[in-house]
């Protein structure tokens, strides 16, 4: 299988940032107020330290989505000498107040790791035109708000292709937080479409944990799927992800990681990892602000595997354990997606 190097992914992000320069409002970020001062990395006079606030709806130690976002912000803070404030466990009912407080306190950027924070963020952003806001995987945006999103289907489609190639029972299991949200249905549609593109007889059994942190529920769902004959189980439900993978490995069943790369958990039973890292989007936001090339976009900008925003990372340890046709199918599907020849019916 052809490997996409870190350099290639980095170049994709760099090219996307360059293209975004043409999408920015030329007047955004100029004038008085917090965002009107010098930013870190600027030349000509003493540069002020960029103040950035970052919030999430869960805990920093979830080992996945929020951990990746938090660690990404820590790296950015060190790399660009940012002054960063972090706040975890922000409930949806408090998002507007938390964002407003940060903006009122003189922060240059106010960022969220949670896509469902984008609606209250748009409302708050209207009252603080000199502050740059940003939301990961946002589906609405504003003139002074940076909004990126992964397609949320391309990497899942590829995971489905690989699962469809390796299954012997023709039955795959998918675990998400719910079974009726748009994101869950997107995961289901794309995973199933990928699998059925190489194996029309595939059935996907979809169940929900109802919680991002109920590990017992995750284990119960995984056990049920395996007992029903699913020989590949894919979980995207927060803290439950690693627990489900551990159970699958114990039971000798193929599994797939969501959000972060957990391929190292097993060189035999982890097929790969669907990666949609918030840290990638956060870096694009901060670097766009620092360079002045991007401080807002009214319409969220969607990027996929070609842009490096999301990816399906095949477990390289399986290269000599699975038939070459498995990896050829993934390569072919990847090329077709990039060429725009793959469509998936989404909610």
Would you name each region that the model predicts?
Residues 1-11:
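Bacterial N-terminal signal peptides that target proteins for export
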Residues 13-16:
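Hydrophobic alpha-helical membrane-embedded or membrane-associated segments
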Residues 18-22:
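C-terminal motif of bacterial Sec signal peptides marking the signal peptidase cleavage site
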Residues 23-347:
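A residue-level marker of the well-folded mature domains of exported/periplasmic proteins
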């Amino acid at each position: 299988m052809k490997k996409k190097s870190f350099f290639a992914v980095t170049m994709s992000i760099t090219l996307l940032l360059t293209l975004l320069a043409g999408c920015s409002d030329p007047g955004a970020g100029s004038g008085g107020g917090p965002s009107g001062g010098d930013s870190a990395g600027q030349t000509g006079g003493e540069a002020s330290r960029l103040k950035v606030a970052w919030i999430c709806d869960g805990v920093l130690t979830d080992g996945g989505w929020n951990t990746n976002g938090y660690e990404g912000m820590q790296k950015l803070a060190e790399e660009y000498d940012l002054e960063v404030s972090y706040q975890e466990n922000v409930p949806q009912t408090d998002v507007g107040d938390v964002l407003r407080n940060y903006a009122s306190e003189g922060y240059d950027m106010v960022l969220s790791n949670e896509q469902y924070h984008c609606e209250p963020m748009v409302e708050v952003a209207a009252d603080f035109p000199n502050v740059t806001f940003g939301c990961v995987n946002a589906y609405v945006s504003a003139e002074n708000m940076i909004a990126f999103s992964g397609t949320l289907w391309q990497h899942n489609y590829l995971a489905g292709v690989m699962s469809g190639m390796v299954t012997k029972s023709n039955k795959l299991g998918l675990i998400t937080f719910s079974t009726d949200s748009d994101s869950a249905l997107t995961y289901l549609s794309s995973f199933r479409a990928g699998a059925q593109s190489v194996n029309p007889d595939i059935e996907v059994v979809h169940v929900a944990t109802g919680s991002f942190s109920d590990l017992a529920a995750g284990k119960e769902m995984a056990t049920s799927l395996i007992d029903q004959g699913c020989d590949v189980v894919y979980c995207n439900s927060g803290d439950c992800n690693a627990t489900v993978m551990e159970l699958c490995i114990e039971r000798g069943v193929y599994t797939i990681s969501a959000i972060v790369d957990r391929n190292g958990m097993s060189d035999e039973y982890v097929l790969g990892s669907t990666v949609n890292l918030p840290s990638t989007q956060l870096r694009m936001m901060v670097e766009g602000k620092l360079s002045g090339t991007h401080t807002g976009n009214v319409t969220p900008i969607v990027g996929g595997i070609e842009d490096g925003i999301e990816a399906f990372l095949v477990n390289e340890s399986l290269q000599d354990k699975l038939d070459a046709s498995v990896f050829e199918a993934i390569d072919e599907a990847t090329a077709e997606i990039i060429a725009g020849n793959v469509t998936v019916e989404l909610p």
